């Protein structure tokens, strides 16, 4: 953001963060929160730290103007890691916080090969039970850089073995399917040719029953544990 001077979740072509997470080899479920501050005097290192701390504080306690999305992302107990980055020049600060749910020890990392998507891994926390594998589609648009938040787009398909099926989206039958509290193993065909960014998201149920109060429509106990995005041109 500092390089392009564009304060947005989206890049200038309208692509959201999940594609860049995948490109960098990050396959866990992640959510990004960003903050910006400007100073009319040159910034020192200590001042930059203080302002960054205030940006983080406001994301939790003064987030009404942003619909409390930052607050709920930062406090959601689904996540067990946070990656915090700060970039700045003489009078601008850009803060990027990525919350990560890293609970899979990969045996075979998620990948696309010969038109098929596959993954295999061990769950490191048996409180998380895999539930749904949903595919979303988002269409990149340059004017999205003005949006205050980002999304994965609309659900277009779900992966599930017979005899189950999805009513409102396409149902894809997997070649391999194991979903339990110890091992996840999936392989299924990809059938998407319409231009867009597709995100494969594995949802899980969190059995820990941690009590907290989201201010948004976020569902308590429903956690993403794997996310893989790819671009169809």
Per-region residue spans from a language model:
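A well-ordered secondary-structure block
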Residues: 14-100, 133-139, 158-203
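Acidic helix-start/capping segments at beta-turn-to-alpha-helix junctions
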Residues: 1-5, 15-18, 149
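A short beta-turn/strand-edge loop motif at beta-sheet boundaries
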Residues: 124-132
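Short beta-strand elements
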Residues: 206-233
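Conserved catalytic region of serine esterases and O-acyltransferases that act on ester linkages
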Residues: 119-124, 144, 178-180, 192, ...
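Short, compositionally biased P/S/T/A/G/V-rich stretches that sit at domain boundaries
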Residues: 89-91, 97-125
């Amino acid at each position: 953001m500092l390089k392009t001077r564009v304060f947005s979740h989206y890049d200038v072509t309208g692509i959201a963060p999940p594609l860049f997470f995948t490109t960098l080899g990050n396959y866990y479920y992640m959510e990004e929160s960003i903050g910006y501050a400007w100073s009319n005097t040159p910034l020192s290192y200590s001042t930059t730290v203080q302002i960054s701390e205030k940006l983080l504080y406001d994301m939790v306690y003064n987030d009404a103007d942003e619909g409390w999305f930052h607050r709920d992302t930062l406090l959601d107990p689904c996540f067990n890691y946070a990656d915090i980055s700060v970039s700045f020049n003489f009078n601008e600060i850009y803060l990027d916080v990525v919350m990560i749910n890293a609970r899979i020890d990969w045996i075979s990392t998620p990948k696309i090969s010969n038109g098929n998507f596959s993954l295999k891994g061990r769950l490191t926390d048996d409180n998380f039970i895999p539930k749904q594998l949903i595919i979303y589609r988002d269409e990149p648009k340059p004017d999205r850089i003005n949006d205050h938040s980002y999304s994965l787009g609309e659900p277009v398909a779900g992966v599930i073995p017979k005899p189950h099926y999805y009513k409102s989206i396409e149902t894809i039958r997997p070649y391999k399917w194991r979903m339990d509290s110890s091992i996840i193993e999936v392989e299924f065909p990809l059938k998407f040719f319409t231009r867009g960014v597709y995100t494969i998201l594995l949802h899980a149920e969190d059995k820990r029953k941690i009590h907290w109060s989201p201010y948004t429509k976020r569902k308590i106990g429903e956690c993403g544990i794997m996310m893989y995005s790819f671009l169809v041109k």
